[in-house]
């Protein structure tokens, strides 16, 4: 059996088309959705991510603002800039690209973003609201994964799901969203004693640790859905995920590739979150 491919590029194209239609409708009413992206320092990977986010905004009718600062920017100056953006009615989403230089407290920076503009879904108010099932914003990567399940009709209610990874950005919110959808969820991590014992029982496995080949074919239940959130490089420097794709695709029922799987969905859901913020702001101003 060869797994069916979950194509993140194709689904992203559909969802971005819908986002562009909503953006055009808002713009016609004088409320063009606006996203501000802040980059501090010269991390090459961060620069690529920011460029892709700005391009996605431009391609889909959003107003975008990029603030690029040297790594020497003070924490106080960054917090002051966030405060300005919080009060700017043209801006509906604020994103600070992580990681930040060591002298800046990323937790303090995230908490400085107004919860109603926290389109990454990282603010403690949104993280806490996710626990109740009613967040203003869901973190973009796990939100994108949920859209993949939905688009392919993958049943979550009653399913056994394993999330490998416990980060605040992917692992923990992914587990909460699966739980909210009715799955029975196990979170595995670096201290898990027998990872394979958990994954072999899982109908759904989400790998999100940033470690090559953390999941191999012998660890996967036949017919399971495998979502690869990892972004790594193989020995030849080629982009790869956390899953041994060549082996696992012969066992799984569904699988996401890297690249072209979860990655495009992350930026797409950032657009969706920004649109939802702009729609709320337009409704409040009406």
Swiss-Prot record:
- CDD domains, A to Z: NAD_bind_m-THF_DH_Cyclohyd
Q: In which pathway does it act?
A: One-carbon metabolism; tetrahydrofolate interconversion
Coiled-coil zones = none
Catalytic activity reads: (6R)-5,10-methylene-5,6,7,8-tetrahydrofolate + NADP(+) = (6R)-5,10-methenyltetrahydrofolate + NADPH; (6R)-5,10-methenyltetrahydrofolate + H2O = (6R)-10-formyltetrahydrofolate + H(+)
Q: Does the keyword Hydrolase apply?
A: yes
Task: List the molecular function annotations (GO) for this entry.
Answer: methenyltetrahydrofolate cyclohydrolase activity; methylenetetrahydrofolate dehydrogenase (NADP+) activity
Entry's Gene Ontology BP terms: L-histidine biosynthetic process; methionine biosynthetic process; purine nucleotide biosynthetic process; tetrahydrofolate interconversion
**Which keywords does the record carry?**
Amino-acid biosynthesis, Histidine biosynthesis, Hydrolase, Methionine biosynthesis, Multifunctional enzyme, NADP, One-carbon metabolism, Oxidoreductase, Purine biosynthesis
Q: Where is it found, in Gene Ontology cellular component terms?
A: cytosol
Could you say which residues bind NADP(+) here? 165-167, 190
**Keyword flag Oxidoreductase:** yes
Record function comment:
Catalyzes the oxidation of 5,10-methylenetetrahydrofolate to 5,10-methenyltetrahydrofolate and then the hydrolysis of 5,10-methenyltetrahydrofolate to 10-formyltetrahydrofolate.
List, alphabetically, the PANTHER family matched. Answer: C-1-TETRAHYDROFOLATE SYNTHASE, CYTOPLASMIC, C-1-TETRAHYDROFOLATE SYNTHASE, CYTOPLASMIC-RELATED
**Assembly state and interactors?**
Homodimer.
What is the name of the protein in this document?
Bifunctional protein FolD
Q: Which organism is it from?
A: Burkholderia cenocepacia (strain ATCC BAA-245 / DSM 16553 / LMG 16656 / NCTC 13227 / J2315 / CF5610) (Burkholderia cepacia (strain J2315))
Gene (UniProt):
folD
